[in-house]
Amino acid sequence: MSHEDCIFCKIIDGELPAAKVYEDAHVYAFLDISQVSKGHTLVIPKVHTKDVYDTPADVAGQLFSVVPTIANGIKKAFQPAGMNILINNEEAAGQEVFHTHIHLIPRYGTEDDGFKAKWETHNDDYTKDDLEDIAWKVAGSMTCTR
């Protein structure tokens, strides 16, 4: 997707409306139109990057540096019982708009708050050696971007 076709880039450029929550030189945050729960906010970099894999470390740092401020604003405004903070990367993980974005989803402790993430444990499937092998493969595959 090019910058010209990106709905989030159009929001940043003022071509499409959005309920803005926060803006600085590098980051823009606005309410998700779906409002999975009241206060559901998206935090995006102003520079177009497809997903976290495509995002330079400095841009990621700018993006994540404002998350606590926005999360605390949501907490103060609505007193949620908790909050999920997540990024969907690529279609298989649920990414629908291919511009890096962080979801801040307030949770109100009710079954109908709109978000249904649940992890199933597989700890019995992995030995200590399996975990060490997985960690070694991940660590050996990383490229330092600092």
Language model: regions and residue ranges:
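HIT superfamily nucleotide-processing domains
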Residues: 1-146
